[in-house]
Amino acid sequence: MCSSDLDRVCCVGGIPQSGQLDTVLVVDVDEEFESVIGHEEDMLPNGVSAEALERLTAIATDLALTGREGKSIGAMFILGDHEEVYKRSKQLILNPFHGYQDEDRNILNPFMDETIKELSLIDGAFIVRGNGVVETAGSLIQAKADNIVLPGGLGTRHAAAAAITHATNSIALVVSSSGQVTYFRKGRMFTLFEKSAGRAF
């Protein structure tokens, strides 16, 4: 996490699978995010580890890029404040993670990648603790979307992600079937990756 008002992030990227880097972007963190989210300490909620967010972002980006079984899919991951998130959700299926040890259902465990990708085929959100432990999958988010304004053309996943991050101290990552990954914090959205553009933002 950034530690001062002078922090800058250097991003280097290119078209996936091209083997070439063609874009360099330097971002002034304070200037870029404070006007949208607030103070920089609000960017990562209390109790959410940077490692868990980084891993979840990698999984979401991979899903956006490759889909599952040759098909484009959509998915939603909610990270942090899991108890409050859970109060505003309803299971659509029996919880596939019930009864497993924490270390066996943590997204930081590389063996979880295939499980997460497979369960992304079902409707509903993944609810994930701030430390990366997956609480449940297949959850219907029932937070109210009052006073949430989103660009036209976005679906129910985006509306639910905006609403739940507005109502709780969480982060949401949404993968759309068009191959876009969007980050939500405090009801606001930021596009992280778009398959059609072939690069991260």
What are the language-model segments listed below?
Residues 1-3:
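Short, small-residue-biased leader/transition segments that mark boundaries at the very start
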Residues 6-7:
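Flexible, glycine/charged-enriched surface loops at secondary-structure junctions
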Residues 10-14, 78-80, 128-129, 175-176:
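Short beta-strand segments
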Residues 11-16, 20-25:
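Internal gly/pro-rich beta-alpha loop/helix module
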Residues 23-158:
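Conserved mixed alpha/beta catalytic, RNA-binding, or beta-rich assembly cores of soluble enzyme
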Residues 162-184:
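Glycine-rich phosphate/pyrophosphate-binding loops
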Residues 186-188:
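C-terminal beta-strand edge segments of enzyme domains
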Residues 190-201:
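Acidic, PIN/NYN-like endoribonuclease modules and their adjacent C-terminal/linker elements
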